[in-house]
């Protein structure tokens, strides 16, 4: 695995806390760990002695994605831990495009996992969270008891051809002057 990147504080953006103050259905207080100069936010709810369920969100969301799942998991007696990936939600956002590599995201989240000391976890991951979360499992399999994968996978890099649909999405995300993030997230949610 790549060594932990350290980001210059002058190149870090941070969303003000008051932007999260009145969000419906998400009463959870964020905790923070600093990894490589970045503040990574996460929620940690439920009994400390319970084996955790680690919820890894996809792109372009944050831990808020799981707001409908968290109450049920807590009611069942589980501990729930849900980080905001770097660049999303309450976590810091590097301002330099070159800092946003897949290797950096994996290194940051492995560092976070070690700092929070995730043990005996059930990983629930989807979308971009699966690409990072499954690498966390391969890095430290002894920290995980179970894996639940939704809408994701772990490409080996040997497929040779990037799917056309992904190329179209990447071009849209990179070059579109109009990026309706709310509509994009909403279109992937049950109504």
What are these regions (language model features)?
Residues 72-74:
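Short hydrophobic signal-anchor/transmembrane segments that target glycosyltransferases
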Residues 55-58, 82:
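Structural cue for short, hydrophobic secondary-structure segments
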Residues 2-28, 38-40, 45-52, 65, ...:
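Flexible "cap/lid" subdomain of the alpha/beta-hydrolase fold that forms the substrate-access gate
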Residues 59-70:
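The serine-hydrolase catalytic nucleophile loop
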Residues 31-35:
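Short acidic-hydrophobic surface loop/beta-edge motif
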